[in-house]
A protein has these predicted regions:
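Short amphipathic alpha-helix that is part of the acyltransferase structural core
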Residues: 1-33
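Structured beta->alpha junctions
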Residues: 7, 74-77
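Active-site rim helix/loop that mediates acceptor-substrate recognition in acyltransferases
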Residues: 21-51
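Short coil/turn segments at beta-strand junctions that form active-site/ligand-binding loops
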Residues: 44, 66, 98-99
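Conserved beta-strand in the GNAT
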Residues: 47, 52-62, 67-74
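Feature marks short, surface-exposed loop/turn motifs that line or immediately flank catalytic pockets
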Residues: 64, 77, 107-110
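Conserved acetyl-CoA-binding loop-helix of GNAT-fold acetyltransferases
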Residues: 75, 81-94
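Conserved GNAT acetyl-CoA-binding A-motif
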Residues: 95-113
């Protein structure tokens, strides 16, 4: 399996298929905000590919160099409870060129149009 950035179309697919299913609407950023943040270079929506299939996601909000917030960790519903989430975290660790800080919090998302 390989952790890499998706195409924009793949991002839209996993947002609708995985993130909307796994997270309450109040905890889910609007897709347009994720796309805008990614285009501006301070958000990385990594996906774990098993061949051509995306089986999980780790979306990172980049901050000070060497630091990132794990914004979403999600595994496709058909692949849950099989170690995919742990594999995603391990592959992030293996990237080695950044230190990651994981912060879990609940918040109300404000649209940043």
């Amino acid at each position: 399996m390989e952790l890499r950035l998706p195409s924009v179309e793949q991002l839209r697919t996993v947002y609708d298929r995985d993130l909307k299913e796994a997270f309450p609407a109040a905890e889910l950023k609007p897709l347009r905000n994720i796309e805008k943040s990614w285009a501006e270079g301070w958000y990385k929506p990594y996906c774990l590919f098993d061949g051509d299939n995306i089986v999980g996601e780790a979306f990172l909000w980049l901050g000070h160099p060497g630091w990132a917030l794990l914004d979403y960790l999600c595994v496709s519903s058909i692949r849950r409870n099989g170690g995919v989430g742990a594999s995603i975290l391990e592959k992030l660790r293996e990237r080695g060129n950044q230190a990651y800080v994981i912060i879990l919090t609940a918040y109300d998302w404000v649209d940043i149009e």
